[in-house]
Design a protein with these regions (language model features):
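Acidic, surface-exposed loops and disordered segments
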Residues: 2-193
């Protein structure tokens, strides 16, 4: 698969882009990551794919249930099938690979766990210059049939990964200012500066 054994002792990972090679700390990774739906044809190395999947494996889950399972989709015809099975992710057919994140709905926190694992995969990918985007809208029965998803698991989130077809550096995020989002001690109390 993607290398059953991986090294866990690296503190910093290298990010490879067309423009530069740089170490990113967690905050920089969060601050510079964009959702990208337009991918180039450049292949992602098996080592980088392994790191992305290893990040998923290492993510914490509620009560340490580790109830999630992952279907890796790489073949072009299956990526196209995945795009057809979506209601909002037609762009995934252009991804280098995609991950169908399956969770067990018997755990009330399964959606939170799905978000946690996807964020870890996306940030790990971006650390290597690999962009990504997710979608949740699917034709459930069709997706289950096409990818043999068992009835006890939900296809909760699908993430497509690839190198961006366009330049990603220098873009600015459109985010609300912190003082419109955060309150001090009680809702409505402005943050003290």
């Amino acid at each position: 698969m993607y290398g059953a054994s991986t090294q866990h002792n690296s503190i910093y990972f290298m990010r490879h882009t067309r423009l530069s090679i740089a170490n990113m700390d967690a905050f920089e990774c969060i601050a510079t990551k964009f959702d990208i739906r337009d991918f180039s044809s450049q292949d992602i190395s098996p080592e980088t794919k392994s790191k992305i999947l290893e990040a998923a494996r290492l993510t914490g889950s509620g009560l340490n249930t580790q109830h999630w399972r992952f279907v890796i989709v790489e073949k072009k015809e299956n990526l196209e099938k995945l795009a057809e099975d979506s209601t909002s992710g037609g762009w995934v057919s252009g991804a280098n690979f995609a991950v169908i994140v399956l969770t067990n709905p018997r755990y009330k926190f399964h959606m939170i766990d799905a978000g946690r694992v996807v964020q870890d995969m996306q940030l790990t990918a971006w650390n290597y210059g690999v962009t990504s985007c997710l979608f949740t809208g699917v034709q459930d029965e069709k997706l289950r049939s096409d990818f043999s998803i068992p009835k006890e698991l939900n296809p909760t989130i699908i993430v497509g990964f690839g190198f961006s077809a366009k330049r990603t550096s220098g873009k600015r995020k459109n985010r609300m200012p912190l003082d419109e989002l955060v309150y001090y001690e009680k809702y409505g109390n402005p943050v003290r500066r």
